[in-house]
Amino acid sequence: MKLIFFVKDGCGVCENAKEKVDFFLEKWNARESVDVETVNLSTSDGLVEAAMRAVAEIPTIILEDTTGEVARWMKKAPPSEDLRTRLGV
């Protein structure tokens, strides 16, 4: 599984969402089974990646498995139980 965080410099909500997800990954001992990637929309590469994935809000968190996108949460961290269920931990 892979979590992709779309964030922007100076976004407090983005930082809080990432901290919340990091906390639960650690709590559930899921850190090694979930790759975490951060895409910064303050960069041109980040803007291109966001456009390719139709990301229009920050933060946006996308969960992917080997088949593609499994879930997407926008403007906030995912609810912990929803994330846990989707990760299967």
Model-derived features: positions:
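Local sequence-structure signature of Cys/Sec-based thiol-disulfide redox active-site neighborhoods
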Residues: 1-30
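Non-catalytic interaction surface on structured domains
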Residues: 21, 33, 62-66
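Structural micro-motif
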Residues: 53-62
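Thiol-based oxidoreductase modules, predominantly thioredoxin-like and allied folds used
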Residues: 8, 30-46
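Non-catalytic, surface beta->alpha helical segment in thiol-disulfide oxidoreductase systems
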Residues: 63-89
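Short alpha-helical
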Residues: 12, 45, 78
